[in-house]
Amino acid sequence: QPERGKIYDRNGKVLAEDVERYKLVAVIDKKASANSKKPRHVVDKKETAKKLSTVINMKPEEIEKRLSQKKAFQIEFGRKGTNLTYQDKLKIEKMNLPGISLLPETERFYPNGNFASHLIGRAQKNPDTGELKGALGVEKIFDSYLSGSKGSLRYIHDIWGYIAPNTKKEKQPKRGDDVHLTIDSNIQVFVEEALDGMVERYQPKDLFAVVMDAKTGEILAYSQRPTFNPETGKDFGKKWANDLYQNTYEPGSTFKSYGLAAAIQEGAFDPDKKYKSGHRDIMGSRISDWNRVGWGEIPMSLGFTYSSNTLMMHLQDLVGADKMKSWYERFGFGKSTKGMFDGEAPGQIGWSNELQQKTSSFGQSTTVTPVQMLQAQSAFFNDGNMLKPWFVNSVENPVSKRQFYKGQKQIAGKPITKDTAEKVEKQLDLVVNSKKSHAANYRIDGYEVEGKTGTAQVAAPNGGGYVKGPNPYFVSFMGDAPKKNPKVIVYAGMSLAQKNDQEAYELGVSKAFKPIMENTLKYLNVGKSKDDTSNAEYSKVPDVEGQDKQKAIDNVSAKSLEPVTIGSGTQIKAQSIKAGNKVLPHSKVLLLTDGDLTMPDMSGWTKEDVIAFENLTNIKVNLKGSGFVSHQSISKGQKLTEKDKIDVEFSSENVDSNSTNNSDSNSDDKKKSDSKTDKDKSD
């Protein structure tokens, strides 16, 4: 069987790879020991069961029951007796149990567990052939590349089994190709932690967050809830669709930005010109502003800041309904971006009657995907050029050095001019930063954030109108930073919060957006300081395995990296990041020494740092919370063994206490219940 290709992040960190694991088997038939000086079958079933239970997750009684089967020569232990690690193998071998053996088998290993799971996907073993086959995500999309090809041995032999001379033809297996993604593991950690916090706080039905490079279209991080753990298989199959591009939804007022851009391009938007807010009666349905009564006659610019529904309907009238639809199409809605490889949903521009046309102006009736929204939004920061989002950097074979695919920045179209893009961005700035902003809860101290909030009613799954309940909303925010020259776009959305629903309604997704954006900007060294080093060169990790400890420390430090030694020895036997990988300056490189294992001071470490420690030392670490390490159960310098378990607690340095007294902190389309109730009746 060929080795399956690996999946890497943008910095060369392994996200999925093959590892050798072991399956536990037991010979229980006495006949196996015939003519043997040493027993080859299980002799003491009770003692064997007792010892094995300390390694595999089975009770001694359950193991003993299996060992006591009649008429069986050899038995296995089900799923609990498979996927055993090398450390498990060593522990069992030290027990010297007669009749017990471990068979090697290849398994797919996902070192980070629940981590960009719907993007990376999962490979599963065919129970009949033993082959790994991609079942979801990149593992499935690029399965033909990752799988490689089998080897073979052909020859001619006679009836006695003798091989004829010069007939043997051997074909070596071809190793699978590697897939390199655009995601950054560090930013992915920020996303995973933020979403975990949102689930704990709000218990939503659906939740997602995505980070995109505003200047290249590269997806730097993406995750969703519910999700699954590809390493353990927990919750796998609970939700198959990748919400980034396979599920559509009505976006709400984040969609207003594209109608605004069309109106500016057509000369219909005059920021100082006043219009009448409040409500409109369309086809027997009353469509109101989110506060039901509007604000009287107000300037168009203030109407956009307030996220007025009547403003967007007014602009549609000025542009013309059919022409407005064509503008949405220019922004890429109603069709696939053709950049996501498999099963991308096109969405639909709802335009069959006047009611749909008018409600589409504020993001109802029309359906989209997050990747379409990101593509359209990118036009505002690239002189009117839309960038196609992409998440695969390359597909290449490490043996042959042949490259089969290379991702690159692609312009998907130019719907608007540079001047229009700049004018839209100015309005996005006012939405968040003006004195009359209703989105102040998305501001981040020291960073210049701009963007657009969204609140939409959620379509009922059976197609009958909209979901009912105390908080039947999809809340979202599409934001970028720093303004005028954004580095990243962060888009987060949450549907149907079941807990703290009033807070979810008022604060939207700010408790996810803010830590993701702030941590990402800090990580990329942009924002607060005037020196933008976001384009700084990556540091290449040196090869220090086998070196003297002090020499290794000096060599790592010379690359502007932070060496952290683990152990009491004087020589380095392993390092957490492979030599040659490129990482951002000041990244931690863990160096495992010979001698006794000792506990490092993990204060301030990220989850990724702790996971790297776990992978390097094979010591189990239980993680609790999110942010940075604030407590560890074993003190610094204490000796460790592989039997130890370490509890590590995290807390965020970005505790969000910046709540606002503004009752409409996320209220761009709040209380549209009047208009939506009427619309439900008319649909």
Feature locations, PLM:
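Conserved, well-ordered alpha-helix/loop/beta-strand core segments that scaffold catalytic motifs
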Residues: 164-207
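Soluble non-cytosolic domains of exported or imported proteins
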Residues: 2, 39-46, 82-86, 132, ...
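Small/polar-residue-rich segments within soluble enzyme cores
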Residues: 47-54, 68-175, 492, 511
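Juxtamembrane extramembrane loops of integral membrane proteins
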Residues: 3-56
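Second-shell loop/turn segments in exported
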Residues: 27-41, 49-52, 73-82, 105, ...
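Conserved SxxK-family serine transpeptidase/carboxypeptidase catalytic domain
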Residues: 81-95, 101-118, 122, 393, ...
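Ligand-recognition elements built from short beta-strands and adjacent flexible loops
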Residues: 446, 460, 492-683
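Beta-lactam-recognizing serine transpeptidase/beta-lactamase-like catalytic domain environment
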Residues: 16, 158-167, 207, 212-252, ...
